[in-house]
Amino acid sequence: RDTHETWYLETQEGKNLPVPHCIRGTEGWQIRKELDALRKTEPIDKETFGSTDLAADLLALHEDEEIGSITLVGLCTDICVISNALLLKATLPEVPIYVDAAYCAGVTPESHENALKAMEACQIKVMR
């Protein structure tokens, strides 16, 4: 879950993307209630584009019980989704990583498509 603090605009990301969003505790920060039943663990709050905590948690899980594959969805394809897909591919190179394009969106349709192509070039399987 994309998570920022009230001082977001003072961060490197905030200076380059000066659009306050996903501020902890505000409307729009929480994952939609309709998805609660599908969750098996608490959400991981990620304060940057890619989550090293997500990668570490999945690596630990994989070491205990082999992960067959990972599917990513979300916003923004061209920022957070691609960052996490590449991070997971580097952390778990033998686990197939999928991105379901129907459940992703980029800043623009063009940047969405460019991100999907970049992920495909890095052996991430894009479901179209």
What are these regions (language model features)?
Residues 1:
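Short, solvent-exposed turn/loop segments enriched in Gly/Ser/Thr/Pro and often Arg
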Residues 4-128:
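Active-site-adjacent betaalpha module
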